[in-house]
UniProtKB/Swiss-Prot annotation:
Alphabetically ordered keywords of this record: Cell wall, Cell wall biogenesis/degradation, Cleavage on pair of basic residues, Glycoprotein, Repeat, Secreted, Signal
Domain comment as written in the entry: The PIR1/2/3 repeats are required for the covalent linkage to the cell wall. Their number varies among different strains of S.cerevisiae.
Protein name in UniProt: Cell wall mannoprotein PIR3
Main location: secreted
Family: Belongs to the PIR protein family.
Site (Cleavage): R67, A68
UniProt GO MF annotations: structural constituent of cell wall
Site description Covalent attachment to cell wall glycan, residues in chain: Q76, Q102, Q120, Q138, Q156, Q174, Q191
Organism: Saccharomyces cerevisiae (strain RM11-1a) (Baker's yeast)
Biological processes, Gene Ontology terms: fungal-type cell wall organization
InterPro entries: PIR1-like_C, Yeast_CWMannoprotein_PIR, Yeast_PIR_rpt
Post-translational modification remark: Covalently linked to beta-1,3-glucan of the inner cell wall layer via an alkali-sensitive ester linkage between the gamma-carboxyl group of glutamic acids, arising from specific glutamines within the PIR1/2/3 repeats, and hydroxyl groups of glucoses of beta-1,3-glucan chains.
Length: 307
């Protein structure tokens, strides 16, 4: 896949905090290719859950419950690592976001990614849970459960490592998430069959997860992702997926070109696979393979409901 060269940005030091002004609008920081059949506008907010590419190919496309990713205060997205979450849309755990905007995911449950306050996104490994976001905007995911990602306050997205859950968002903006799988049925002649699923082209999201304050909750409009604090979902200089700004942080590679595929996964340009890379107890999410602790995943879009 061919991408446009990232636009050059200039740093301004008018105050003790660095700011930057792109030479062109940051919304032009987009891949050159687009995903066939992808939708760039979605009518409601949604979370994401981490699903391993290897297991996704063999899983049944039936209704299931997942946890959403969480977000911490920095904007990171994170996901949990070991537990699986709970419903005719199937349910998943959402990723969480911490305050910095990162997205993270947990190690062993499939949970949704969370976002911490700095905007990073993190996610967990094996349960299906929603990603969470911490305050810095990062997105992280847990190791083993499929849960939704969470976001911490910095905007990172993180996900846990062992359960499949939806992501959540913490105060720094990070996104965290865990993961899940679906089962097959057996008919009387002994054959094992997977249920066929028909998706609505206008609404390919067929999984739901419980929403909470740390769950990464995103909006998609004209190919631009924003979290509940209005920060921009971007691929930053180190290839990590997190939420910052607006505008995105200096050196951001992509800040637009997002879509939801006909299969219900988040895509950037014509790419619908990402990488969760282990960082302590959480995975950070990237658009490229950056090391031996990285695994290819899908970021499954999930509708968020009050539980």
């Amino acid at each position: 896949m061919q991408y446009k060269k990232p636009l050059v940005v200039s740093a301004l030091a008018a105050t003790s905090l660095a700011a930057y002004a792109p030479k062109d609008p940051w919304s032009t920081l987009t891949p050159s290719a687009t995903y066939k059949g992808g939708i760039t506008d979605y009518s409601s907010s949604f979370g994401i859950a981490i699903e391993a590419v290897a297991t996704s190919a063999s899983s049944v496309a039936s209704s299931k419950a997942k946890r959403a990713a969480s977000q911490i205060g920095d904007g990171q997205v994170q996901a949990a690592t070991t537990t699986a979450a709970v419903s005719k849309k199937s349910t998943a755990a959402a990723v969480s976001q911490i305050t910095d905007g990162q997205v993270q995911a947990a190690k062993s449950t499939a949970a949704a990614a969370s976002q911490i306050s700095d905007g990073q996104v993190q996610a967990a490994k094996s349960t299906a849970a929603a990603v969470s976001q911490i305050t810095d905007g990062q997105v992280q995911a847990a190791k083993s459960t499929a849960a939704a990602a969470s976001q911490i306050s910095d905007g990172q997205v993180q996900a846990t490592t062992s359960t499949k859950a939806a992501a959540s968002q913490i105060t720094d903006g990070q996104i965290q998430a865990s993961k899940t799988t679906s089962g097959a049925s057996q008919v009387s002649d002994g054959q094992v069959q997977a249920t066929a699923e028909v998706k609505d082209a206008n609404d390919p999201v067929d999984v739901v997860s419980c929403n909470n304050n740390s769950t990464l909750s995103m909006s998609l409009s004209k190919g631009i992702l924003t979290d509940r604090k209005g920060r921009i979902g971007s691929i930053v200089a180190n290839r990590q997926f997190q939420f910052d700004g607006p505008p995105p942080q200096a050196g951001a590679i992509y800040a637009a070109g997002w879509s939801i595929t006909p299969e219900g996964n988040l895509a950037l340009g014509d790419q619908d696979t990402f990488y969760q890379c282990l960082s302590g107890d959480f995975y950070n999410l990237y658009d490229k393979h950056i090391g031996s602790q990285c695994h290819e995943v899908y970021l499954q879009a999930i509708d968020l409901i009050d539980c």
